[in-house]
Amino acid sequence: MKMHRAVHIAAAASDDYAWCARLMASSDPWITLCRDLEECRSTLTRPGSELFVARDQESEKIPPLGFILLAPYGFAGSPYIASVAVAAEAQGLGIGSQFLDFAEQHFRSHAHLFLLVSSFNQRAQQFYRRHGYEFVGELNDYIVCGHSELIFHKRFHD
């Protein structure tokens, strides 16, 4: 059983973007969604998006252990988690959960937080449900034919 790893999450430095794009382009769901390296770079630098990386709290070593891409007004004017990725060697250490906690704190003044999960990504769907996100809709054939993007939502205030 892997142990929980404490990380430091901070805004990405300019040299982190290439690493994050390579991580995206070399892993699912982006492989199945036919996203190449250039499309991943473009996603990470989209105007209005904020990229944050996690580094080991003990050593702050390079490269990062993963990233989260946030869009403050990305879904119907509400905050949106655009992407979360954790390097294969760091998966199962609680880093994804720390990214969600970070995003929720970052957007705490808002009532809602949204994200999309690919229909084939069962592991991510379970992960988000465990963290209190609810399935609220489906976009059929949204990115690639044959797969849907599932809309998940978390409400912070009543």
Tell me what each language-model feature is.
Residues 2, 141, 145-158:
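Terminal substrate-recognition subdomain of acyl/acetyltransferases
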Residues 102, 126-127:
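Structural preference for long, well-ordered alpha-helical segments within the folded cores
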Residues 115-125, 141-147:
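Conserved beta-strand-loop-alpha-helix junction that forms the acyl-donor binding cleft
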Residues 128, 133:
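Conserved active-site tyrosine of GNAT-family acetyltransferases
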